[in-house]
């Protein structure tokens, strides 16, 4: 996650590091496939109860525009994160097309991951904060996110 609400240099750095990983993989003949962990924000912004179709050619240009917009909201951390994931993944696929390496690229787009905090001092500064909000009865903090359940 970005440690600033400024998109530069975070978005460019994430994109460059992603391409660098692909270049490194291409230089090693034993690499058969690369899996890029992207984000659902690379394809779409979270929008509760808004039906839509997502395809391999769906890109969240909206999040990139919002990240670079001076009129964006004050806390742009998630917006910048989403823009970095979209920019990096899109550039990765462009790089694959331009360079035709010997390996296959696959991309996964999870929406939210929960697990133990790597750094206990910052345990509630990321997605774990959503769990704490729900535990503390502040579930309204998550109203802007779509439901993470399936009714059977």
Locate the predicted segments by residue.
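NAD(P)H-binding glycine-rich loop region in Rossmannoid oxidoreductase-like domains
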Residues: 1-17
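Active-site Tyr-X1-5-Lys
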Residues: 27, 62-105
């Amino acid at each position: 996650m970005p440690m600033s609400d400024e998109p530069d240099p975070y978005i460019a750095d994430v994109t460059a590091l992603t391409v660098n990983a692909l270049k490194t993989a291409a230089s090693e003949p034993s690499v058969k496939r690369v899996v890029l962990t992207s984000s659902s924000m690379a394809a779409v912004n979270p929008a509760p109860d808004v039906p839509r179709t997502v395809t391999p050619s769906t890109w969240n240009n909206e999040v990139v525009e919002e990240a670079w917009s001076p009129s964006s909201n004050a806390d742009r951390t998630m917006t910048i994160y989403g823009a970095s994931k979209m920019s990096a993944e899109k550039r990765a696929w462009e790089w694959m097309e331009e360079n035709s390496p010997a390996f296959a690229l696959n991309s996964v787009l999870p929406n939210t991951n929960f697990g133990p905090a790597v750094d206990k001092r910052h345990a509630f500064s990321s997605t774990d904060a959503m769990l704490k909000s729900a535990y503390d009865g502040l579930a309204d903090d998550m109203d802007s996110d779509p439901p993470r359940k399936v009714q059977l």
